[in-house]
Amino acid sequence: ITHKGMWIEVSSLNPTDKQNYISALTCFMLGAVLLGVHLAEVGFLGDDAINSMPEPWLLILRIVMILLFFIGAFFHYKFTITQDDLFNSYQSACFVGGAFGFLTFGLSLTALSPYFNFYPTFYEYFLAFAIGTVIGGYSFYRKYIAES
């Protein structure tokens, strides 16, 4: 776990774990790109729906997106089960931090939005989750890894 809890050192992994980690990351990133296209098509990103893609292609895109996320989850599971308790605790801290960030920052945005005539979209909620993940990873790093 490097960069003050923001990343793991991939070069330190054994070849099988490295392959599983990179495969999971690749599938998740490709799935995320397709999710972005899908969200833009349906207008969930705050703008009007684009509706530029024919429905059969949009259906194929959605199926491939879901498959990529499931394949990524499979490789991530294969990677995670071989890791030690420290890494699994780190991963849990990051996800709990993300959920906390979503609840505190995301729900605060929602509660305050009518007063500022600002209506959060997917990006703002994702940013709230990402901020919480960074806080969770950094807190774990400070508590368990950093040398005083």
Predicted regions and their residues:
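Alpha-helical propensity feature that highlights long, continuous alpha-helices across diverse contexts
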Residues: 1-82, 86-148
